[in-house]
Amino acid sequence: MIPGEIMAAPGDITLNAGATPLTLTVSNTGDRPVQVGSHYHFAETNAGLSFDRDAARGMRLDIAAGTAVRFEPGQTRDITLVPFGGARKIYGFNQGIMGAL
């Protein structure tokens, strides 16, 4: 083994296995790009993004950890969200929840 080497099990890895996905259409109505990270509470994203925020409550992007999605000004795209796991408590972000979902 080489120091730092990772020996992964054979086969494919399924991200967010077992999570119930939700697809929403999101539009950037602002004049600047908006980038949203993989674990950001999507309902609390930049006000320039137009989408059903109530439906997105307690959800995050269904993308690999450490990655992000960028919305250019005027761009509309479909995104997939998955529920936060664990204790389902949200703190920080834009302080819209600050506790249990």
Curated annotation (Swiss-Prot):
A GO molecular function held by the record: urease activity
Cellular compartments annotated: Cytoplasm
EC nos: 3.5.1.5
Any matching Pfam family: Urease_beta
Pathway(s) served: Nitrogen metabolism; urea degradation; CO(2) and NH(3) from urea (urease route): step 1/1
Cross-referenced InterPro entries: Urease_beta-like (IPR002019), Urease_betasu_sf (IPR036461), Urease_subunit (IPR050069)
Catalysed reactions listed for this entry: urea + 2 H2O + H(+) = hydrogencarbonate + 2 NH4(+)
Cytoplasm found in the keyword field: yes
Biological processes per GO annotation: urea catabolic process
Protein's recorded name: Urease subunit beta
Species: Dinoroseobacter shibae (strain DSM 16493 / NCIMB 14021 / DFL 12)
Gene: ureB
